[in-house]
Amino acid sequence: DNKIYCGEGEPQYNNPAWLKETTWGNNGIRKLLRDHATANGTKPVTRIELAVKELNAEKAKNPKMYPDSIYQKKLSKLKAGELKDGKIPTLTVIIKPSDNASYKNMVDALDEMQILSIGTYVIDKLNADDLHLLKLRGVKL
């Protein structure tokens, strides 16, 4: 149905309200990931995005100082939360497409990980508990 459902933290398999519906793009899943705050109030995606923009600006000013190998190494450190002002916690995103998810939606989900410089994400299968939660939420599978 071209929809995204997501939850934060440990799944609450008997609480259909835990699962939130959102949309694709800047005002949907991207905003949700940007606005996610850790227990100490850090918004890791926003902080890492800013650091990547700074890295890209430095590379644009001095392209010879940033051959691809150096750029990729610095980018990997940023994605791991290693910022100039210290290490921050990062997000781990688990992508669980349903059997009727389209290839385009899967590619779009992976694109969001790249756009937001999310360094840790996995693709997993829906398990019985996930299916139960989706059914409680009224999601058509």
What are these regions (language model features)?
Residues D1-L141:
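Long, low-hydrophobicity, acidic/polar, solvent-exposed interaction domains
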